[in-house]
Swiss-Prot record:
Organism superkingdom: Eukaryota
Single Gene Ontology MF annotation: metal ion binding
Summary of the function given for this chain in its UniProt record: Ferredoxins are iron-sulfur proteins that transfer electrons in a wide variety of metabolic reactions.
Recorded family membership: Belongs to the 2Fe2S plant-type ferredoxin family.
Cofactor binding: number and manner: Binds 1 [2Fe-2S] cluster.
Subcellular location: Plastid, Chloroplast
UniProt keyword Nucleus present: no
Gene source species: Datura stramonium (Jimsonweed)
GO cellular component labels: chloroplast stroma
Keyword terms, alphabetized: 2Fe-2S, Chloroplast, Electron transport, Iron, Iron-sulfur, Metal-binding, Plastid, Transport
InterPro entries assigned to the protein according to its UniProt record, in alphabetical order: 2Fe-2S_ferredoxin-like_sf, 2Fe-2S_ferredoxin-type, 2Fe2S_fd_BS, Beta-grasp_dom_sf, Fd_pln
Protein name, per record: Ferredoxin
Gene Ontology BP term (one): ferredoxin metabolic process
Length: 97
């Protein structure tokens, strides 16, 4: 399946379609959108965002704890969309405090 991903970035919102077997960060780059990242392996906070609508599968990541995921935080480098989803990007500072 392919879902609509909306990223709310500091430069304004962008939307694109993302297959459910492609990481959101990878698809964003394919579409020409620059997003923050570092390890690309789900083990740091550089690419962190916050899901405000929809659901993702980020089981490949290991950096976020259950509470952080329950709060909506997502690592875009290891997140597959499971529905149409809206994510606020550039949330590393909010995540790490």
């Amino acid at each position: 399946a392919t879902y609509k991903v909306k990223l709310v970035t500091p430069d304004g919102p962008v939307e694109f379609n993302c297959p459910d077997d492609v990481y959101i960060l990878d698809q964003a780059e394919e579409e020409g959108h620059d997003l923050p990242y570092s390890c690309r392996a789900g083990s740091c906070s550089s690419c962190a965002g916050k899901v405000t609508a929809g659901t993702v599968d980020q089981s490949d990541g290991n950096y976020l704890d259950d509470d952080q995921m329950a709060d909506g935080f997502v690592l875009t480098c290891v997140a597959y969309p499971q529905s149409d989803v809206t994510i606020e990007t550039h949330k590393e500072e909010e995540l790490t405090g």
